[in-house]
UniProtKB/Swiss-Prot annotation:
InterPro entries: p53-like_TF_DNA-bd_sf, T-box_DNA-bd, T-box_sf, TF_T-box, TF_T-box_CS
Subcellular location(s) per record: Nucleus
Gene: tbx20
Pfam family, one: T-box
Gene Ontology MF terms: DNA-binding transcription factor activity, RNA polymerase II-specific; RNA polymerase II cis-regulatory region sequence-specific DNA binding
SUPFAM superfamilies reported for this sequence: p53-like transcription factors
SMART domains cross-referenced by the UniProt entry: TBOX
Protein name from the UniProt record: T-box transcription factor TBX20
Function: Transcriptional regulator that may play a very early role in the differentiation of the cardiac precursors.
Organism of derivation: Danio rerio (Zebrafish)
UniProt DNA-binding residue ranges: 108-287
Gene Ontology terms describing biological process: angiogenesis; blood vessel development; cardiac muscle cell proliferation; cell fate specification; cloaca development; embryonic heart tube development; embryonic hemopoiesis; heart development
GO (cellular component) term, any one: nucleus
Chain positions covered by the region annotation Disordered: 50-80
Amino acid sequence: MEYTSSPKPQLSSRANAFSIAALMSSGKTKDKESEENTIKPLEQFVEKSSCHPNLGDLPPLETHSDFSSGGGTGSGAPLCTEPLIPTTPGVPSEEMAKISCSLETKELWDKFHELGTEMIITKSGRRMFPTIRVSFSGVDPDAKYIVLMDIVPVDNKRYRYAYHRSSWLVAGKADPPLPARLYVHPDSPFTGEQLLKQMVSFEKVKLTNNELDQHGHIILNSMHKYQPRVHIIKKKDHTASLLNLKSEEFRTFVFTETVFTAVTAYQNQLITRLKIDSNPFAKGFRDSSRLTDIERESVESLIHKHSYARSPIRTYAGDEETLGEEGHSAHSRGSAFTASDNLSLSSWVTTTSGFSGFQHPQSLSAIGTSTASLASPLPHPIQGSLPPYSRLGMPLTPSALASSMQATGPTFPSFHMPRYHHYFQQGPYAAIQGLRHSSTVMTPFV
């Protein structure tokens, strides 16, 4: 008996849309679209000038009644900031149109811009380097001006640094917006005469990623690109303080070479090197190989003098003048635990540790003559017969001094010699601390 399959019932268009085949096919098309929208931008290179045209896409500047507050009502702008500078007609007044602004240290900014400037942001706030310094011209000498700065995002994208390509790539959309803030220069208001004579430096501006910051620092998102802007506002005489900016005249200046990426740690090693070489406050990060010959000699001489001054055994005051030439000075600055004739004190202690008294007058006289510069400034008739430890700065007891003057030859004070071997193993500082005591009973280190 043969079984025949019954014909499948025909489904309506609505029912067919919810079938397994239709759902799977629609899921594949959605996956393809999402891959095209998310994966491809990650592989696109970010051109150095690609961020500048987006500056024209900034929304119109919104008015803000409170000058000191950090934010305002949302304007629905796609960017992560809400500009706080009030809106005025596009064409500035004749007086404000005459004002021009130039960026100081432009050459340094250009060097960083070629590599892709990065600025560190921290919870406590970090200052910018290079610092934004500007100078104004065309201002009225008798008028008063307020200089401000804010930092706005370049676009609504988030970036990541590709180390294998040494370039920045788009990593997706920007993070949620942070409170926008204006930084008023602390010396404001300036007179026009002051602005003509001096430059305005925003060296105290600090960048932070702390959303709850209460110190007035500019809050930024990490791995986002930003553009600093400088604003100059003409202050009217009848206004005591800037509480309402609706009636104030202002002008904004943007320098494209100051665009930077906010980071919590430097991504590009070339940026790190350039900042170390250019920042005068980063001298601690430089090694001696980057110094000039003159600087290196001065640094080495300072280190040499410092180590010599800290030496526990050195010549007495006034004896340095009698040393004479460089050979004597170099010998006096040498290690106090190395004698002449290639005889080290450690080997000398080892060879004489088995005797209760010193029985080698020839070696002792050689040591005495070589270390004469390390003794007291006044010559002594029994200089060559004194025990070696007296010439190293150890005070002698009367009994030891008397025994050294006997015809039988010099002897050591009444302590056991092998114990001092432990002192010299501890280094010069620990050794002198043990030798400095005037007691004849010496105990070894535990």
